[in-house]
Amino acid sequence: MRIHYLLFSFLLVLLSPLSVFTQSINNPVSCVTHGGICWGRCPGSFRQIGTCGLGKVRCCKKK
């Protein structure tokens, strides 16, 4: 029965960093924190990683 607790804690520690990547970027501060810039439309060498909280302003990061 103790192996279940060990397995659960191991999976919790192993999968917890993945929650960082699933959080949405929806404000300018988190955009800059993740290495992006707030731009109206992402230029060719950039990709969209979120929004900057306003309607059509996107958070773009270099590919």
Swiss-Prot record:
Pfam families: Defensin_beta. It comes from the Eukaryota. It is found in: Secreted. Gene3D superfamilies: Antimicrobial Peptide, Beta-defensin 2, Chain A. Coiled coil: none annotated. One of its GO terms (biological process) is chemotaxis. InterPro entries: Defensin_beta-like. The keyword Magnesium does not apply. Disulfide bonds join C31-C59, C38-C52, C42-C60. Residues 1-22 form the signal peptide. GO terms for cellular component: extracellular space. Keywords: Antibiotic, Antimicrobial, Defensin, Disulfide bond, Pyrrolidone carboxylic acid, Secreted, Signal. The modification Pyrrolidone carboxylic acid is found at Q23. GO terms for molecular function: CCR6 chemokine receptor binding; chemoattractant activity; phosphatidylinositol-4,5-bisphosphate binding. The keyword Amino-acid biosynthesis does not apply. Has antibacterial activity. Belongs to the beta-defensin family. PANTHER family: BETA-DEFENSIN, DEFENSIN BETA 4A. This is Beta-defensin 5. It comes from Rattus norvegicus. The gene is Defb5.
